[in-house]
């Protein structure tokens, strides 16, 4: 919605969120610190991610080993191309299942919250491994990119995980207040169009 809330949606730039001086000012003045409660959540999430990752990897490594063994003991029915196709299919399924499960750990949405904190840090948190999700410093060179990602993730969490919004609000009350105000204004603009 932020993209389409521009003054002229047919032209690039001048997104609704970054055209709001109040949001840009609050964003610039918001600390990139992480409260203990949020840091504990991220640590728990990382631990659970590793468990899920290891579980999914083990499941598919067993299937890949069975496939490889069938080639070695000559019980595999098919050509080398058939083997490669089945192998690639297993690897793809492993990656898809791991990604799906990782995004839904602990009710989902924690990656969105991590992305917000990564944006506040200018990508440093992802670069240093403080968070698992985000874009890193090369993406966040521009303040506008940070704001765009923050508003997108905030809007998603507002719908799917209001409990995580409350956690962010406890840590960054001024930012949350301005994000809420921005979304209200954007919804008014969309309603007028």
PLM feature segments, named:
Residues 1-193:
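Active-site-flanking segments in enzyme catalytic domains
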């Amino acid at each position: 919605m932020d993209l389409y809330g521009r003054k002229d949606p047919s032209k690039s730039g001048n997104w609704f969120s970054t055209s709001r001086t109040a949001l840009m000012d609050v964003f610039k003045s918001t600390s990139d610190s992480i409260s203990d409660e949020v840091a504990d959540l991220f640590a728990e999430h990382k631990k659970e991610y590793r468990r899920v990752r290891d579980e999914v990897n083990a499941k598919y490594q067993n299937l890949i080993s069975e496939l490889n063994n069938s080639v070695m003991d000559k019980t595999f029915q098919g050509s080398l191309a058939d083997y490669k196709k089945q192998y690639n299919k297993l690897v793809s399924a492993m990656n898809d299942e791991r990604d799906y499960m990782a995004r839904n750990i602990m009710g989902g949405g924690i990656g969105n919250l991590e992305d917000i904190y990564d944006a506040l840090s200018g990508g440093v948190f992802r670069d240093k491994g403080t968070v698992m999700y985000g874009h890193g410093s090369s993406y966040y060179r521009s303040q506008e990119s940070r704001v765009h990602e923050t508003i997108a993730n905030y809007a998603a969490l507002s719908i799917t995980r209001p409990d995580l919004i409350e956690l962010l609000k406890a840590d960054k009350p001024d930012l949350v207040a301005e994000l809420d105000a921005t979304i209200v204004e954007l919804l008014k603009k969309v309603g007028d169009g």
